[in-house]
């Protein structure tokens, strides 16, 4: 399975120069497998769970990549929070799209997702079998890479209790521990400074990217008080981005 989805991604990139309007940028291209085993101390029952999590899909020649979906060939779905929490003595303490995880482009990649597994009362064994923690999904035709994946133990704790996990590991958890599973964003298609400013504004207002990212990577300057595009400042910022890109 892991090999198949990565080969698909590699083939798409290889075919892209000859089929530019039919190929998407890179996706998460992995199963993103999260599993845990836990013994409920109240009744002695043993529980185990396995999930394959979604991530950002690559952008295409005419549209953005979908946010937090399963990629080509995976044929799985995310388990609903209510289902997981009703069957296992744990909590999904956070489930969200990851802001600024898209691969910037004329059409942006889809956002990755964050799912935090919290074990309030019982020790547990957690398994990460995943990838993309070194390099995020690549963009094409001037598009940029999506944010890479992160796997973090106790993400909201002090530095002493927080640690970054590798993409392939088994970790023993104590009561109160949390594992944050953060999948990558999809790659972008085309230069970011060619993106429609209205689309950038929509992403900012929708909480998918922040104002600074809009300015620095897309060259779109948005007034933070009115949430309107500053056209003169945007024209200047985009000219500077194009000049910088051409000089490199």
Where are these predicted regions, by residue range?
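Glycine/proline-enriched, intrinsically flexible loops and inter-domain linkers
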Residues: 1-248
